[in-house]
């Protein structure tokens, strides 16, 4: 199992090292300020811990039989350089464990708080800020892998006496297999309906089991990993735990913003102030 730690390296050096050693492959696109992320393994799990007060950010990356520990000083040239937006070759999940994460999606900027989650299909351009204090889990799943998860889920749904309500996460995975929707830019906003700590208590055992299975990859691990992912996606798509909003990023800016505001007001039962909306959406209160 390969391990490495990167300290204050340049962007070029980082790309070169990752391309040589890492299942996460980052390439610069022809367009300026844009990168493309690909993965060479069925899935990648990343845990990002940012501590601005301690001037560092740790990225722990797990994939089958592979582990990387990347450390960035927040005062380094790499950390201070504006991150280019990127696009994935696969679906990406972001779940905020603690603190808040600022996410740039196209020309919009949003803040996700602890307990909130977003799922993006492969056509969404975005980037996260390495700033503030937060901890978040990122899951990247190849198309072939999600297809297997979907097949298993649909088989269970077909044979159970009480099928579940529509799971929007598995629906997004199904849409990725649909050629007529291959160019749609869709992501899901997931806001907790119950206390974030209660959700994390249920998710943490699955996150831990997934990481342990990944770094101790052995016979049967692929089956166990699929089972854990299926349970994770079922929980994240549970309508009793999350209010999930399906958003098309190619909507006009005002329509896109309206969808976000509507979802926030719905999940907060109308108790979100204009100042709180300013913080979450990075817009002037008068404009909102």
Q: Where do the PLM segments sit?
A:
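N-terminal regulatory/effector-sensing and dimerization cores
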Residues: 67-178
């Amino acid at each position: 199992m390969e391990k490495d730690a990167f300290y204050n390296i340049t962007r070029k050096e980082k790309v070169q090292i990752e391309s040589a050693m890492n299942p996460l492959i980052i390439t610069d696109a022809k367009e300026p300020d844009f990168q493309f992320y690909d993965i060479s393994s069925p899935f990648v799990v990343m845990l990002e811990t940012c501590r601005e007060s301690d001037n560092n950010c740790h990225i722990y990356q797990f994939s089958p039989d592979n582990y990387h520990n990347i450390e960035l000083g927040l005062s380094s040239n790499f950390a201070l350089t504006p991150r280019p937006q990127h696009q994935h070759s696969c679906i990406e999940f972001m779940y905020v464990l603690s603190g808040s994460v600022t996410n740039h999606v196209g020309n919009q900027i949003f803040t996700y708080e602890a307990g909130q989650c977003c799922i993006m299909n492969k056509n969404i351009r975005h980037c996260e800020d390495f700033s503030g204090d937060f901890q978040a889990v990122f899951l990247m799943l190849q198309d072939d892998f999600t297809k297997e998860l979907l097949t298993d889920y649909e088989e269970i749904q077909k044979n159970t006496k009480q099928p579940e309500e529509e799971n929007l996460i598995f629906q997004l995975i199904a849409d990725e297999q649909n050629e007529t929707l291959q160019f749609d830019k869709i992501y899901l906003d997931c806001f907790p309906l119950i206390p974030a700590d209660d959700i994390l208590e249920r998710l943490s055992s699955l996150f831990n089991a997934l990481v342990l299975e990944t770094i101790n990859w052995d016979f049967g691990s692929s089956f166990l990993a699929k089972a854990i992912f299926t349970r994770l996606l079922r929980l994240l798509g549970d309508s009793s735990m999350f209010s999930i909003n399906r958003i098309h990023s190619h909507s006009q800016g005002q329509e896109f913003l309206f969808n976000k505001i509507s979802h926030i007001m719905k999940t907060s039962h109308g108790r979100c102030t204009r100042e709180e909306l300013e913080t979450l959406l990075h817009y002037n209160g008068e404009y909102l």
